[in-house]
UniProtKB/Swiss-Prot annotation:
Its EC number is 1.14.17.4. This is 1-aminocyclopropane-1-carboxylate oxidase 1. Its cofactor is Fe cation. Belongs to the iron/ascorbate-dependent oxidoreductase family. The gene is ACO1. Keywords: Ethylene biosynthesis, Fruit ripening, Iron, Metal-binding, Oxidoreductase, Vitamin C. Pathway: Alkene biosynthesis; ethylene biosynthesis via S-adenosyl-L-methionine; ethylene from S-adenosyl-L-methionine: step 2/2. PANTHER family: OXOGLUTARATE/IRON-DEPENDENT DIOXYGENASE. It catalyses: 1-aminocyclopropane-1-carboxylate + L-ascorbate + O2 = ethene + L-dehydroascorbate + hydrogen cyanide + CO2 + 2 H2O. One of its GO terms (biological process) is ethylene biosynthetic process. PROSITE patterns: FE2OG_OXY. Signal peptide: none annotated.
Length: 322
């Protein structure tokens, strides 16, 4: 296991003072070489975060725990009987809330009204933070302010934004199942509010698994496949996983600020060098990418990119012949 001491942690307060150039350089390095970083003093109140954590854990205990225990008992039995089946399971209890383009939080069963209102407040704060971070990335990339948020909005004028709320309960057989299998994220920029007492999130760097350190009131940020494409590979999405733990119930609230379903994604022209003879990344509609991703989430991302490059080539050839 590689040490966590070098994992990038960025104090966003420094962006407002004399240390801004150094903080921006640290952010750029994290995006280029890690694809993950942790931010402190990000503008979301600690009181709101504490309330979200309390109500999320209470909701799991009250509504989801018994269901998961029943699922877990069946899962472990089947996994012991069929190891191949166990390798395709994740030891997590989740529900998903969509915020944009239209919220579905009123339709999620078993959420009390206070929790719904709280999650809407939290989502609004995260949306603002995501767009702020995207503008900081634009600054480092030499793109005009708002380029990334505009690219994400697409013709319909709205990104896709949603939150996956997960619990990773204690697992008696972490040798048998993962908390969440290794993958890259399909979308844009991901903001994670994770448990500060129970770890398990790891990223793959230089062939080694690196722990993402739990830190109180921090937000973990990682970059998805779409930012890799738009930045023409300058920034990369990174393989990560959640390791099942024998002790503790890990909370994870991951909010995905993604392109709208109709957004056309391609490398930013300003980041494509004229001398590049071979196109590194394809052009595609985000919804089409997601259709491919859901079938191949736990596989390497490169074949997904290549599949769309092949489609582009075939289309160009048909046009040329016509």
């Amino acid at each position: 296991m590689a040490p966590t001491s070098t994992f990038p942690v960025i104090n966003m307060e420094l962006l407002a003072g004399e240390e801004r150039p150094a903080a921006m350089e640290q952010l750029d390095d994290a995006c280029e070489n890690w694809g993950f970083f942790e931010i402190l003093n990000h503008g979301i109140s600690t009181e709101l975060m504490d309330e979200v954590e309390k109500m999320t854990k209470d909701h799991y205990k009250r509504v989801r725990e018994q269901r998961f225990l029943e699922f877990a008992s069946k899962t472990l039995k089947e996994g012991c009987d069929d190891v191949n089946k166990a390798e395709k399971l994740d030891w997590e209890s989740t529900f998903f809330v969509r915020h944009l383009p239209e919220s579905n939080i009123a339709d999620i069963p078993d959420l009390d009204d206070d929790y719904r209102r709280l999650m809407k407040r939290f989502a609004a704060e995260l949306e603002t933070l995501a767009e702020r971070l995207l503008d900081l990335l634009c600054e480092n990339l030499g793109l005009e302010k708002g380029y990334l948020t505009k690219a994400f909005r697409g013709p319909a004028g709205a990104p896709t934004f949603g939150t996956k709320v997960s619990s990773y309960p204690p697992c008696p057989r972490p040798d048998l199942v993962e908390g969440l299998r290794a993958h890259t994220d399909a979308g844009g920029i991901i903001l994670l509010f994770q448990d500060d007492r129970v770890g398990g999130l790891q990223l793959l760097k230089d062939g080694e698994w690196v722990d993402v350190p739990p830190m109180r009131h921090s937000i973990v940020v990682n970059l998805g496949d779409q930012l890799e494409v738009i930045t023409n590979g300058r920034y990369k999405s990174v393989i990560h996983r959640v390791v099942a733990q024998t002790d503790g119930n890990r909370m994870s609230i991951a909010s995905f600020y993604n392109p709208g379903s109709d957004a056309v994604i391609s490398p930013a022209p300003a980041l494509v060098k004229e001398e590049e003879a071979v196109v590194a990344y394809p052009k595609f509609v985000f919804e089409d990418y997601m259709k491919l991703y859901v079938r191949h989430k736990f596989e390497a991302k490169e074949p997904r990119f290549e599949a769309f490059k092949s489609m582009e080539t075939e289309t160009s050839n048909r046009i040329a012949i016509a």
